[in-house]
Each structure stands twice: as C-alpha cells, then as structure tokens.
Design a protein with these regions (language model features):
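Carbohydrate-active catalytic/glycan-binding domains of CAZyme proteins
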Residues: 1-223
C-alpha cells in the first residue's frame, strides 16, 4: 500500500485510507493516493485522490505534500482535504486545502495559507518569515466534534507549540474573525510536539502526540 502518513475517513460504512504515494521516490511525486476497505483488512486501491501536478508548482517534484486528512461536510456535501505543503528546506510550512464530490476524488486544489498570524515573540532570524506570512503549519490532523464543528490540530511556531484552529462552516479555512481562546488556541506551549492524534471518548477529549526528533523514535505523549 502506497499511502504514507495516513489519514482514514469512515463514510457510509466504507473506510478510506489517504496517504502519500511514494512509488516514484521519497518526495511523493505522484500525489495523495486513496484505498478503500469495509473491514480494515482487505484494501482496494481507488487511485490518486489528489494529483501532485494539481498543487502549486513549488510543492511538486522535490516539494512536500504530506499528512493528508479528509473530512466529510454534511452541510455542503463535499469532502474536504487538508494537508501540509512545504518546499524542500521546509520553510514555506503552509496548509493546503482541496475539495471533492466523492471520497475517492478527484480532489480540486483550492488554496494554501497559514491559518494564524500571532506574535508569540518572533525570533530575530526566522527562515520561515512568520512575522510577515503567519505562523508555520506542519504536521497536522483534523477532528470533527459531535456538534459538527471541525478543527485543525498542527505543529506551529516552527514546531515549538501546537495550535488548535476551529474551521469555518465549509471546512475550507479558519473560522473568522479569529480570536485566541475562542476560535483558536495555543497548547503544549514550547514543548516541541507533532503528529497530533485527537479523539473523544466518554465525553472527554484526548490528544496523543510525538516528540520532534525527525525519524528517530521517541515516547508518545498524551493530554
């Protein structure tokens, strides 16, 4: 299965597994592949949900298109994909958004941006230019609550702090106007956590994260 950094969506009794297709190499020159299953054991390749050549040129070839996650918006009846987009030096660090009419796509790329611009004490030397462009967006996940509201969890501030951002009604961007503590929040401040996995169980919210050690293993943490 070529679907790295996977995100799984359950829709009408079918599981859809989205992830990076690295058949042509580590830089994911193909795009985001999707597989389907009814039992989480037998998987069928449905094709490429988001082709790499459909994202802006700087993210093709040696650029980064990863961590794709998909939600179904029952209001718009659209499938919405969020992903981490970056250049090879990991300096662009932005969120990409695409939509589709069907879970297997094809997804149409909409835009990329950094959802929050907040002065956390910008470093004097910052290769990601957060002061001008907004705070970085890297390893991420999506979460939809029981009330239908959706949220993006992601590593920001050059991976030092994690953000939670409530999405708009269409799930295609942050809820506006942005207000810290109301529509978005800083969590795990200065703890360098990434790969967030949020879920809700018995009325409580849980978040599992990884430390930022690259490909080296580390202990998972939970909150």
């Amino acid at each position: 299965i070529q679907a790295h950094s996977a995100g799984i969506l359950l829709h009408q009794g079918v599981y859809y597994w989205y992830g990076e297709d690295k058949t042509l190499g580590n830089f994911n020159r193909t795009g985001i592949a999707v597989y389907s299953s009814k039992d989480l054991y037998n998987w069928k390749r449905e094709g490429v949900a988001l082709a790499k050549d459909s994202v802006p040129e700087q993210f093709r070839e040696s650029g980064v298109c990863e961590r794709a996650k998909v939600l179904y918006n029952s209001r718009t009846r659209k499938f919405v994909m969020w992903m981490h987009l970056d250049d090879k030096p990991y300096a662009v660090a932005s969120a990409g958004v695409a939509i589709a009419d069907k879970p297997a796509g094809p997804f149409r790329f909409l835009s990329y941006s950094r959802p929050v611009k907040f002065d956390f004490g910008y470093p004097e030397k910052d290769r990601t230019n957060q002061r001008e462009l907004g705070n970085t967006y890297r390893e991420m996940n999506l979460f939809i609550d029981s009330d239908g509201r959706a949220y993006a969890f992601y590593a920001s501030e050059d991976n030092w702090t994690m953000y939670i951002v409530r999405l708009n009604a269409e799930f295609t961007g942050p809820e506006m106007p942005r207000a810290e503590g109301k529509t978005w929040a800083r969590i795990l401040v200065r703890q360098m956590r990434e790969a967030p996995a949020p879920f809700k169980h018995n009325g409580k919210y849980f978040l599992i994260t990884s430390g930022c050690t690259g490909w080296k293993p580390n202990r998972a943490g939970y909150a």
